[in-house]
Design a protein with these regions (language model features):
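Conserved pre-ATP/AMP-binding loop-to-beta segment of ANL
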Residues: 3-20, 54
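AMP-binding/adenylate-forming
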Residues: 33-40, 56-133
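Gly/Ser/Thr-rich phosphate-binding loop
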Residues: 137-194
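Conserved ATP-binding loop and adjacent catalytic segment of the adenylate-forming AMP-binding
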Residues: 171-214, 224-228
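AMP-binding/adenylate-forming core of the ANL superfamily
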Residues: 208-236, 251, 306
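Conserved C-terminal "lid"/linker of ANL adenylate-forming enzymes
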Residues: 290, 302-304, 316-358
Length: 358
């Protein structure tokens, strides 16, 4: 889907839009969402970040998914000048920017992408991979450093990327988003650079959060979601003091992992994200932790890696992980499966008859 296609859908007489989930934890799903709730979400984000009519925005995410759609809706609702590039791993590269187009929703006319880019972008959204790649190339890093408000979603921010983001000037506000397709993009933000950098997400004023008996985050966001949403994210809540809190309420949260990313192996509970975080500084090749059913252990942890030297990978695991966290199987693949939005695609891995070597 390109911008023209989406605008035709947005401007038709239907009051709903068809969206697709990314499929990072299973098969992608279709769902219909109300345009009015998308408008609400757009206004909430723009108001919080102080985005004004006539400001510039940068679209480098696929319009097939909610993140790209919402970036466009924000531009329409707040009358922004929108620069569009083809979704890719290096959206700030010369090659990508040379093909950029622009639409001025403030004056309802076309405009020069080059002129807007020269002035600097006021608002952009990217996935972690795009940010990481941009920070790795001096010319792209310089351009990234001139984006006034950068929101990062669609995947976890690992320690290495977080450290790089902390080196950006405080004048550039970099945020990690929390949300999903069902909440029409994000319902909470946490700062990634400057003195306010934190691991705690702060919900918007119109959003309330709690945890259920299983420890999963429950979201009450009536402006964007008609019913309370019970997530699969295991969360911890914290009442912030007045100096730390934003807006009208003081409850913040942090995500410890996903309920469906919990491996129960021989009575030991292993959180997939924690294992990956411990290994990431020591494994250079892309990898992921997943699980499979096992007659003896119930479930067992499996490490999937693009590294062909699985003996070395296993050695690192035994050195860096607690004994019962060490994967029981190691598999080589040519490419770690990813969704179109840049998330690791764990769902259905063992149903695809991938040839394994352990």
């Amino acid at each position: 889907m390109d911008l023209k296609d989406f605008l035709e859908i947005w401007e038709n007489e239907e009051d709903r839009v068809l969206v697709h989930t990314s499929g990072s934890t299973g098969k992608p799903k279709e769902m219909w969402v109300e345009k009015d709730k998308m408008r609400n979400s757009a206004r909430i984000t723009c108001d919080f970040l102080g985005i004004q009519s006539g400001d510039s925005a940068f679209l480098c995410l696929p319009l097939d998914y909610i993140a790209g759609k919402m970036m466009t809706v924000r531009s329409i609702e707040r009358e922004l000048r929108l620069v569009c590039v083809e979704p890719c791993g290096h959206p700030l590269s010369n090659e990508a920017l040379q093909q950029a187009t622009a639409v001025d929703f403030h004056t309802s006319s076309s405009c020069s992408a080059a002129t807007i880019l020269a002035e600097g972008i006021d608002f952009a959204a990217m996935v972690p991979m795009q940010v990481f790649n941009s920070l790795s190339v001096p010319e792209e890093r310089e351009r990234l450093g001139r984006i006034k408000n950068l929101i990062i979603g669609g995947g976890a921010i690992d320690e290495a990327l977080a450290a790089k983001l902390m080196t950006l000037p405080e004048e550039i506000a970099v945020w990690s988003t929390y949300g999903m397709t069902e909440t029409l993009s994000h319902i909470a933000l946490r700062r990634l650079n400057g003195p306010d950098a934190s691991e705690w997400y702060h919900p918007f004023d119109s959003v309330k959060v709690e945890v259920n008996q299983e420890g999963c985050l429950v979201i009450d966001a009536p402006l964007v979601c008609a019913e309370k949403l019970v997530t699969n994210d295991i969360a911890e809540l914290k009442v912030m003091d007045t100096s730390e809190s934003w807006g009208s309420h003081r409850v913040a949260f942090r995500i410890k992992g996903r309920k469906d990313f919990l491996i129960c192996s021989g009575g030991v509970k292993i959180q997939i994200e924690e294992v990956e975080d411990k290994l990431r500084p020591f494994l250079q090749s892309p990898f992921m932790i997943t699980k499979k059913k096992d007659e003896k252990f119930g479930e067992m942890a499996v490490l999937v890696s693009e590294d062909v030297d699985l003996d070395e990978v296993e050695r690192v695991c035994k050195e860096q992980l607690p004994k019962f966290w060490v994967p029981k199987q190691f598999i080589h693949v040519d490419k770690i499966p990813m969704t179109e939005t840049g998330k690791v695609k764990r769902g259905g891995f063992f149903e695809k008859n991938i040839t394994c070597c352990s």
